[in-house]
């Protein structure tokens, strides 16, 4: 079995969507098969999970899954980066329905009006889909006259603005990098695009703390998680290291992340989902058979984690309740 990044790049290369020269070195490795399990590092891990909690497969047969978003109609939106589709997945039956063809869709979320936002890498844009998901509007694709790189993940901020990361990992084959850095941006409610951070090596997943005072961003190449103080005007300050996912990168790297109402972080990392306390302690890991890319809270009480991992979607019940910014 290949690592998540290697699987992704093999498929994107085969589709002619990316170039081999653009791939970071950590994307070319193999990993050993693994079984699903919960690995506690601290006893506090069991405050979040029952000892007998099981990870189960919801649906499979995808190309490469990303960007899950729970809808209260009991389905998941799921991006498929290699099949170039966004799907609706019935979580009771596992049935999947194609909604829209879209080149390399990635991280997703809802906005305040419950409209789906997606990072469309081939378009090099953040887009908003129509209510039925069949049409889209571009919200951001240029910064200061230059095209964005390849937007990767997106989150709704406590101020109602949209925040997203813009690495180069999904830059389309033959495309020129016009912006000389990999930024983290804010789309204000009036549509204005603002650069917040430009000194990260490979920004990927991002999330806000439940009190709206912190912005977390992970860096796939550095295998780090950073935290910033979030200000009422939408700016950030005092960036500092929150945690480091120290493991062989061929087992996976930091990617999507979510937060629960107590402030614990659930971050994609080597072998699965790394669970961090709000104080920055790695308290345990959800080991997933396929390497995850992203996750979301779901079900009526938002106590279930839905995880997109390579060709499948998985879920696990928790004793926590998810912090969902758009509710």
Ranges and model annotations:
Residues 296-327:
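Blade-level signature of beta-propeller repeat domains, shared across WD40, Kelch, NHL, RCC1
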Residues 30-54, 178, 325-326:
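Blade/loop signatures of beta-propeller domains
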Residues 164-179:
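Short, conserved, GDST-rich strand-edge loop motifs in beta-rich repeat architectures
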